[in-house]
Amino acid sequence: MNDRYLYRAKRTNNGEWVEGYYAVARDRKGLTQHNILIADNDIGYFKWIVVDPSTICQCTGLKDKNGKLISENDIMVAHLDDSFPEDTTYTRVVWNNNGFCTKEQGSEDISPLDKFDQEYFEVCGNIFDNPELLEVGE
């Protein structure tokens, strides 16, 4: 599976994160369901996992400095100045118009997600499980 097309979201039945393809379908009652499809190699089909649509995050296809995939709504951290180790920068990964960007805490400015972010930042959480990380320093 190409990383760029991966999605992740929280299951509705237990709140666990699942990762796979994203699909919208209707259930037997005609209600819209948001699903993550996970390949079940034992039987050659996909498992359809119902997820909370408010937690759906698309993978950027990029990896952080530790090789971890970066997804929409991830929170990344970096120590950009070794002479001031207490000076920590937190950013949130967001979608803006035509691409993934980073939005630094306490700022309205956004910057394209790029190689600099991959080299210096690491994923340290996400806005759903770790919202307090964005409150640091505000």
Language model features by range: what are they?
Residues 1-138:
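Secondary-structure transition motif
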